[in-house]
């Protein structure tokens, strides 16, 4: 018996050993396979690892991959998680290498630089959580792969990428899926009607924010929608005037955000909102909703916490039923047309409200004292209404809100004094009472508020002084904006304790005394405005210690002493973005000496643009221009000030040569002082300078030739000095009017008298000289007569040998003010190019003006092929047989010259197949000529709109029109995104799209173009650009040209191609309408087919494609600039439709590597 048991034990031992050996071998193999897959991911997907995150990802015998950085394993050694968040990895993501891991459940790769690529058709995966957010993934097939293969998926986040294309199918089979986030991508086209309803019932979170998705909102089906708690379609292109009938099925929704779309019509009434049991946040902001706010919306009051209806066209009042919103904390009704007494009768009874925004409405009467009942109120914004009476004094009493942080009542009609009771609001951080009619002093209690960061009360009639002791109890004050008041006294020394100060504006008051040197201790100070006061003493050298200073305005004071060279040594070196988040307006003085200073920067938060007309600097000056919506910034390295105005003082001494090192300086005004010495040659380093005023000083010496290289210079004034010598030829110096050089007795050259000709002396001096030199004059006269006789004989001999045509040409040339030559460019230049230089990089050969004159038959009408706002275009055949187009700029003082220089500095150095090449230039006296490559078919305007005329218009089928649309878009995209700095065209129109012999579109006429970069965004606009019918609506408000303005103009061109109609045609659209208005109305009414040219509909081109292009045109023509696509996104849309089938590396670059331009101002959100 014992032997049997022993045998059994031995068999069990061997069996167990065999099983364990086999199992161990499998474990080893599985571990090896998982390690190999991770190494394959590192090898195939990671091209750059700057932080050496994967440094320990190396195969070592005996050691598994569980110890590798970012890898997590189960207890039995299987890889279940990979976390490489924010590691800085770059490469092309091959997701299959990771999803092949059989036990991988959690994959976190967000915050890297992965692009899409590799195989997206792998086998099944077992991921539960996938986070690829904040990368550069563009291929939507990766989303389809994840939805189709990862059957256990619970959460997927691919937000903040560059996904393009249409939304695919919804993963109805993923029964565990709860979260899908595809926000902040470039997804486009119509949302499939069943896309939302096809998701499994488990879905709780769906975010499609900030794409280009379109379609009628009412067509969407939400199905049963049982568990959905978060749904956002904000910042898309949804339209329609009704809400989906199945949306109330989502009974458990907590957040519904469909803001920033194109929704029209009225908010649903009736019981539509009664089904929502848990809705806490509803945002319908920034659409086109109209009518009155329905009382039935208050059915949400039992749970509603946040309600945002701002940026629509609602009228009337907030219904009384909203008093039941006991949980409501955030109410935003701004930017509508609301009126009435609802603040008193309704809002004041919602005692739990914390944030109240009703700015930009039509509410009048007194500010209701009953608002003090809202004891939890933190932010009160009543800006830009019609409030009258006094500022309420009841806030922060024992019974009212002790937590009030912001009170904003700017741009109203309040009167009386600033209540001292506001000093009881110990939590107050921001007070903005600007643009009212307040009087009296600012109470001392307000100055002592411990948490006050923003004190803004400009444009009132405030009196009194700024008390000593500011910031003694703490340096929290960041912005002190009290300009345009009646303040007296001196600037207190204690202001130097405001160590967080960013912006000080005390200009246009009655301040006296000296500028405190302690201001130099404010290392965060970015803007200092003390102009138009009676300040005296020296400019403190300590201001050079303000390392963030970018804006210094000291004009119109009584300052003396030398200009401190320290201002150029350290300014603008740190604190990038130190004043971001502020809204500004710059009022530029263009009226010469009638108004002092270069202009003024004003805080623009909560101010309607039309109210700026009240400012003395606007209505008192003969010519001013207002730039609004600006965002100021500083530079992280090698920066400088961008604005320095110390004009109308009594400063003396020399100009420090270091001022020429301020490479970001855009405005330098030293005029009307007592400055001596010479203009530093280092001023050639002011590469961003736009306005340079050195007038009315005692400067001597020559104008430095280096000034001729300042490409951005649009206004120069050196008049009333003692300058001598010639005005440097070249650049823009010869294009400024005579008045800019006047009263410098020794200056000569264009536009003044020619150098070498003596200035005319007084009559008495000439008579005296004549009496002394009679004999000499007689002898000189005889000699001169003999010489003239000899020259006449020689001239007659030469004339007999010259043809009549040559005679006429020579006489014409001799009649010109000065002689000149043409420069002809032989070879191309690589693209893209930096265009900050004033000369071409390739050799030039000479052509005489006579050659161009001969080629155009004296610029006769027979050779003229077109004309525009800035000149005429002639066809010219040169002696070598080549045909060119010559643009002769009109001779308008200043404008033609500025046009000429702008052309030379931009298009002359740019080569692209969809741009008209500038071949050469010519400048002869007052003549300004540009020589272009000749385009056989002329302009799109002529070809498209003159089919039936005798001017050679021809029929364009859809294939030709599509080719033209894509070519023009490609050229404009090149200007916006590949030129460094970027270029805004400013005058895109069909007459500026030329067609070569192959009907390839070429964008032409950059006469209105200005370089756009971080240096030139806000101060460089000198004329309102554009042609009627093509000008975007925002240009009439801010006068600021933007890339999105070009996109709008391109949308008009695309609409022309689709409709065959002109942008403005009173016979077609009436006197009060145009093509855009007509098309938008039809599009809203779902009559888009009526927009299309009948010739295209019968052209077998495919209605679907036509409507795709019509939808793109509609997006380009959105009234809101931020809703328009960029040209990169447009090219991506064309590529998605496979419209651009050519191999185009630059297009691929646009599609996959989009970089933001200078950010355009969006509608301000609280």
UniProtKB/Swiss-Prot annotation:
Motif (Cys pair 2): 748-755
Group of enzyme by EC: transferase
Modified residues (Phosphothreonine): 848, 856, 1141
Carbohydrate-modified residues: 33, 97, 157, 212, 227, 237, 257, 362, 373, 451, 461, 521, 532, 558, 638, 722, 743
Transmembrane segments: 777-797
UniProt xrefs under InterPro entries: BRI1_island_dom, Kinase-like_dom_sf, Leu-rich_rpt, Leu-rich_rpt_typical-subtyp, LRR_dom_sf, LRR_N_plant-typ, Plant_RL_S/T_kinase, Prot_kinase_dom
One GO term describing the cellular component: plasma membrane
GO molecular function: ATP binding; protein serine kinase activity; protein serine/threonine kinase activity; steroid binding
Active site: 987
Binding site for ATP: 865-873, 887
Phosphoserine modification, residue list: 1022
Compartment(s) where it occurs, according to its Swiss-Prot or TrEMBL record: Cell membrane
Per-repeat ranges for LRR: 78-99, 103-124, 126-147, 152-173, 176-197, 202-224, 227-248, 252-274, 278-300, 303-325, 327-349, 352-375, 376-397, 403-424, 427-449, 451-473, 476-498, 500-522, 524-547, 548-570, 664-686, 688-710, 712-734
Role according to the record: Receptor with a serine/threonine-protein kinase activity. Regulates, in response to brassinosteroid binding, a signaling cascade involved in plant development. Binds brassinolide. May be involved in cell growth and vascular differentiation.
PANTHER family documented for this protein: LEUCINE RICH REPEAT FAMILY PROTEIN, EXPRESSED, SERINE_THREONINE-PROTEIN KINASE BRI1-LIKE 1
Record comment regarding domains: Contains two pairs of conservatively spaced Cys (Cys pair 1 and 2) possibly involved in forming some heterodimers. A 70 amino acid island between the 19th and the 20th LRR is essential for the binding of brassinosteroids.
Family stated for the protein in its record: Belongs to the protein kinase superfamily. Ser/Thr protein kinase family.
Protein name from the UniProt record: Serine/threonine-protein kinase BRI1-like 1
Gene encoding the protein: BRL1
